[in-house]
Design a protein with these regions (language model features):
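Bacterial N-terminal signal peptides
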Residues: 5-13
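Primarily the HKD phosphodiesterase
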Residues: 36-95
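Structural recognition of the beta-strand scaffold that forms the well-ordered cores
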Residues: 46-48, 72-75, 98-99, 111-112, ...
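Solvent-exposed loop/turn segments at secondary-structure junctions
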Residues: 51-55, 77-81, 103-105, 117-118, ...
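Signature of lipid phosphatidyltransferase scaffolds
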Residues: 117-181
Length: 181
């Protein structure tokens, strides 16, 4: 009986250890691992990101949306108005996206997938971050507390930023973009 308890305690201890992986740029490591997380999502993706201009990541987000994954995106309003930003494209594709209006800057860079994994770090979701910048990202899984902390932070940020203000912001941006043509 004691032997069985020892074996079971080793099994549960082993499976409860947090796992992490660190990636650095310039290289495709951060981009590829974010895309892999998005592609493996089954239920929910929550993204808080300063800037998103990377076409490959944008396509992975849209693909997850098409698979029926619930997606919420919070991004910086100044960065979202950048001509190469993908925020308007994602908004037009029907994704639930808010521009950050509560604090001066939305400078987070994290994604929570299915309440099981987090990717965070300095990595902006841009081609420059992938190919030119010195950036990092950290993938965390099998760590319920850390993932829960990130999920709670996302929930707070989501609640304090108005969907109505975000919708109005995207509508005004569309009008400004049309006027420039």
């Amino acid at each position: 009986m004691n032997f069985l308890l020892l074996v079971l305690s080793c099994f549960f201890t082993f499976n409860l250890r947090a796992e992490t992986a660190v990636y650095f740029t310039p290289s495709n490591a951060c981009e590829n691992n974010i895309i892999q997380l998005l592609n493996n999502a089954e239920q929910q993706i929550d993204i808080a990101v300063y800037s998103i201009t990377n076409k490959n990541i944008t396509n992975a987000i849209k693909d997850a949306h098409k698979r029926g994954v619930k997606i919420r995106i919070l991004t910086d309003k100044t960065q979202a108005s950048n001509k190469s930003a993908k925020a308007s494209e994602l908004y037009k594709a029907g994704l639930n996206i808010k521009v950050h209006t509560k604090h001066r800057i939305e400078h987070n860079k994290f994604v929570v997938v299915d309440g099981k994994a987090v990717m965070t770090g300095s990595y902006n979701w841009t081609s420059s971050a992938t190919l030119k910048n010195s950036e990092n990202c950290l993938k965390i899984w099998n760590d319920d507390k850390t993932v829960s902390d990130y999920q709670k932070r996302f929930e707070y940020l989501w609640e304090v930023n108005s969907k109505e203000k975000s919708d109005l912001w995207f509508e005004l941006k569309a009008i400004k973009d049309m006027a420039k043509r």
